[in-house]
Amino acid sequence: FVPTQQGTYYLKLLRVEGIKVRALTNSFAANDVAIVHAFYSQYRVEMLKNGIELYEFKPVLERRRRTWYEIVTGSVIPAKGKNKSSLHAKFFDVDGKVFIGSFNFDPRSTYLNTEVGLVIESSQLQTQISVMLDQHLPQVAYQLKLNSQGQITWLDYQANGQVIEYDKDPGTSRFQRTMIKAVSYLPIEWMM
């Protein structure tokens, strides 16, 4: 999910109209394409400032040992198969309509990939999805918020009711965060 400047502006307009906007995407630790996270991450603060609710999928399954490549890049697809949970299907629920598909709503899906999606007009399905998100998001995703200094915090709601707060992308090293920031300056967002 790379909203781009135009997409971020559109989401802001929805909020101005009073529409609740909630996005669930992969955290860096659950992402199978680390470079995409670099371009998504630069829009988080702006989206949060505009009242867009952001959630990042937690890496639910962990292997005990990761390869050097996985440690450096954050990749979650090792040579012998997937080792962590990640989000691939996309869905949106808006005004009684539901979109379900593989389309990422980013430049790569628009211009480079072959993607598919369905729009289903069903208030009942939209309500069910909304209720499921309300019930399960805290267990499967970090909730992103802005602290009093305007910096992102990640809230991890535990089964015992405790909330763990992170001030950096959970599950990342300083090197990975530096690389994410460096890559975000490359002029390749249109390919993400």
List each language-model region with its residue ranges.
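PLD/PLD-like phosphodiesterase catalytic module centered on the HKD motif
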Residues: 2-192
